[in-house]
Amino acid sequence: QTQMMAMVLGNQVAAKGASVRVLLCDAAATLAVQGASFPTFEPAGRTPQDLLRGLMQKGATVEVCAIFLPNTEYESSDLLDGVGVAKPGPIADHMMKPGVRYFTF
């Protein structure tokens, strides 16, 4: 439910014209893995990954944590098209920008 609600809110913010950047870590990073299985949530009848894809179609930047791939069985080729691997330096630079808001789930 946490991942689904995060994606619902991300899509709502993007629909209102805001720029959205998503950093997926730990179990949430599996949202970015092709072929991963997720529960379907009502009332939309969709999965968190479905909403992540929609968020990406709205222009969101989506990245997995730098430590996700080296510490799992996954490789970059397993990620959804358009998902990147975050580099700590650029993420820190982005976090320091005035006006950047954080929502953590």
Please place each PLM-identified region on the residue numbering:
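Short acidic-hydrophobic, aromatic-tinged amphipathic segments that line or gate anion-handling sites
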Residues: 83-88
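Loop/turn elements at helix/coil->beta-strand transitions in domains of secreted/extracellular proteins
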Residues: 16-21, 58-61, 98-100
